[in-house]
From Swiss-Prot:
It is a peripheral membrane protein. Keywords: Cell membrane, Cell projection, Coiled coil, Cytoplasm, Cytoplasmic vesicle, Endocytosis, Lipid-binding, Membrane, Phosphoprotein, SH3 domain, Synapse, Synaptosome. The keyword Ubl conjugation does not apply. This is Protein kinase C and casein kinase substrate in neurons protein 1. The modification Phosphothreonine is found at T184. Residues 13-283 form the F-BAR domain. The F-BAR domain forms a coiled coil and mediates membrane-binding and membrane tubulation. In the autoinhibited conformation, interaction with the SH3 domain inhibits membrane tubulation mediated by the F-BAR domain. DNM1 binding abolishes autoinhibition. PROSITE patterns: F_BAR, SH3. Binds to membranes via its F-BAR domain and mediates membrane tubulation. Plays a role in the reorganization of the microtubule cytoskeleton via its interaction with MAPT; this decreases microtubule stability and inhibits MAPT-induced microtubule polymerization. Plays a role in cellular transport processes by recruiting DNM1, DNM2 and DNM3 to membranes. Plays a role in the reorganization of the actin cytoskeleton and in neuron morphogenesis via its interaction with COBL and WASL, and by recruiting COBL to the cell cortex. GO terms for molecular function: phospholipid binding.
Amino acid sequence: MSGSYDEASLAPEETTDSFWEVGNYKRTVKRIDDGHRLCNDLMSCVQERAKIEKAYAQQLTDWAKRWRQLLEKGPQYGSLERAWGAIMTEADKVSELHQEMKNSLLNEDLEKVKNWQKDAYHKQIMGGFKETKEAEDGFRKAQKPWAKKMKELEAAKKAYHLACKEEKLAVTREMNSKTEQSVTPEQQKKLQDKVDKCKQDVQKTQEKYEKVLDDVGKTTPQYMEGMEQVFEQCQQFEEKRLVFLKEVLLDIKRHLNLAESSSYVQVYRELEQAIRGADAQDDLRWFRSTSGPGMPMNWPQFEEWNPDLPHTAAKKEKQPKKAEGAALTNAAGVVESTSQAGDRGSVSSYDRGQTYATEWSDDESGNPFGGSEANGGSNPFDEDAKGVRVRALYDYDGQEQDELSFKAGDELTKLGEEDEQGWCRGRLDSGQLGLYPANYVEVV
């Protein structure tokens, strides 16, 4: 009976979740340990984002490299080719910015949190943090006298409630005995004495209970003051963490927000300028002069037979090879590129590894001035297929799209003899075909 009564009387206190209850300060102490863990979580968060930025930067670089190669090998030409290529330049520059973002996240933001955490939390030899132990000891010291009084109060309350219970039980028995014929006067007197004794016990326990309760009330202000003092110290420590992490988050935002970067804005300003610089009419004129009616032509004319030059016809018929990359001089004396735009396959087909040959043919049905019969059965492309290895004597930067660029000491393959303008057709080790000045190289 007494056990069930105790449980019922203590139930309201057990459900109380107030900070002032004994032991409930532990949530405030735990917040210190949580702060250290949250610093670790933020560093992990930043580290993962930096990893994403690094991967994205590498993907942009790989994409730009691949498509720049595809564009160079593809059929696009002129100013639009340069505008298209500017997209790859944008990717390279944005890749650099994301690489810088990754570096800022790791070298600045993450290191800043790491250093602050090291200065704010001090590990103990026995485990845990010094700051946590100081808070725990402070709360325990402030709460100890009050907790002792509360223990006395619980005991006094328990005794008072038990006395009340016994009194009620004695009164009930005494009243019931008056209606029972079997109860003797002596027994009736004992029951009455029991009631009187229980009432005295109730009076004594009530007085003690009220006295202890009064003592608790007197110690409560001092208890609250001590607990408030320790709590405010914990609040100040937590405030430093909250303010610091807010500053770090603002730094992270600044590093992530490329829209506020002047370099980022400049990238797209330059990209727009490059795209707007594309001129369809210029490209059409260039194509007309290099692959259309604007090209120079050695029109057929009567030639006297010269017995001293038995291979004249064959040499004349080798000239059409220049359509793949030779340079011819027009009537005004200006060197014009005759590189055929159709010689390059489409951008996407290059990626599939397809090879595209020149579209024109020297078959007799399409070339009334050529043929193996007229050349004594020789193949005008044998010389191109074989080639001769040569070494550059000087640096040369191609001035036209059909010209090769190389450095002194580079080796390349010579694919034809020098023409009357002093140009040779060759192939770089990268596979690029084009023209170069014949006197800039020597045979290896």
